[in-house]
Amino acid sequence: MTTRPNKENRNSVRHGFPRDLIVFLTIAFVITAGIGMAAQVPQAGAERRVTHRPIESFTLVDQNGAHFDLEKLTGKVVVVAFAYTTCVDVCPLITAALRQTQIGLGKEERTRVQLLTITTDPEIDSPKVLKAYGKRYGAEFNNWAFLTGSSAVLGRVWKNFGVGIKHRGRGLVDHTPLTAIVDEKRLMRFVYVGPSPDPHAVLDDVHSLLKHQS
């Protein structure tokens, strides 16, 4: 991940590392997430999957240095993406897609939907670094938190969501390019695996869960 992708691989899911590692991370996700997935539909550079997986509660630290408890979001739809701030290829696409998702939410919907970006590189991604990263993408922090924490706690979170991680050196991390949608009961309902989830498709899934709440 030390160089930007060329024209031939800009839209691939290689994430700047060997194809065999992509296969490994994808298999790791499928095994971790369980066999109960169905309705796999390609979506603008990311594969959409339907699931029904419980997400364990966790407490991390947000971009302001405050403790952030997932349990407090019970009752809300939560869109979760995994990225790290020094990534130069896939993570910017994932974060930009999440920003477009935020823009697509109405005023009332923003009170019912929370966006989360969880780092895959806590060694570098301090709260201050994450806040600057969010600002760079125009994030509105009222319903979008950027989270870090200890490697031990984050390791459990990554595993729970099915995110494979391989640290290759300082500032270099290979990870499953994953965006997940969690419902109001903390069940992961939709997963997008790939570098560029379609914001319109993500919004459609969010709206379907909000409608189910009504």
Describe every region a protein language model picked out:
Residues 77, 84, 102-109, 137, ...:
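Sec/Tat-exported extracytoplasmic proteins
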Residues 1-57, 61, 212-214:
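N-terminal targeting signals for export/organelle localization
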Residues 58-78:
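A short beta-strand-turn-helix
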Residues 95-157:
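Structural microenvironment flanking redox-active thiols in thiol-disulfide oxidoreductases
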Residues 168-214:
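Thiol-/selenol-based redox modules, centered on thioredoxin-like
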Residues 143-144, 155, 161-168, 173-180:
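Structural micro-motif
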Residues 71-94, 98:
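Short active-site neighborhood of thiol/selenol oxidoreductases, capturing the structured segment around
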Residues 55-56, 77-78, 176-178:
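Short loop/turn microsegments at loop-to-beta-strand junctions
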